[in-house]
């Protein structure tokens, strides 16, 4: 998917990018490739692949109608090189984006990238989701939490749901169907008061299958969740 294909596909979906937005995606690509020589950000560095498998894939929840261009508070857990939240922010500038990542080098990259892109209302924090999930400044503060290829739903639920307001939504982007994962995550979702409201499949323009699972938070998360760093992965609920 060339940049021109990317712009044209978005236009067909009703999103006509400004010259500034096109420039932001171009700068994003160039910075990603440059920084990738210093720290391991992605195995995908060829321009057409980045536009398809990183940029287009990241904004799919918007294209599929699951996110509006409103000043909602969005948290991205384990965003790595900024996916999916920063491409979303470029497309929908009204989003207020917070990223938590466990690797400080990635946070350094994202901080400089946001400056290069001229993004406002973006915040970056270095640390573990389990620790921030017990911090009152973060817990129960977000309208949406996104996670792209971070963990299985059984683990991901505990890492993300505590951050949501009641009625807030987890948007999980996956490359494989989540049916089996959701079966395994039933107990975790029950304990965390999360309800699956959408399990959506779609295709990238090249025909590759992708999946979006949306979980709504129904009640306050019990205080004991999330457990200490590492435990959700070692002993899933």
Swiss-Prot record:
EC class of the enzyme, as a word: transferase
Record function comment: Specifically methylates the N7 position of a guanine in 16S rRNA.
Species of the source: Streptococcus pyogenes serotype M1
E.C. designation(s): 2.1.1.-
Cytoplasm among keywords: yes
UniProt GO molecular function: rRNA (guanine-N7-)-methyltransferase activity
HAMAP family linked to this entry: 16SrRNA_methyltr_G
Gene3D superfamilies, A to Z: Vaccinia Virus protein VP39
Subcellular location field: Cytoplasm
A GO CC annotation given for this chain: cytosol
Protein's recorded name: Ribosomal RNA small subunit methyltransferase G
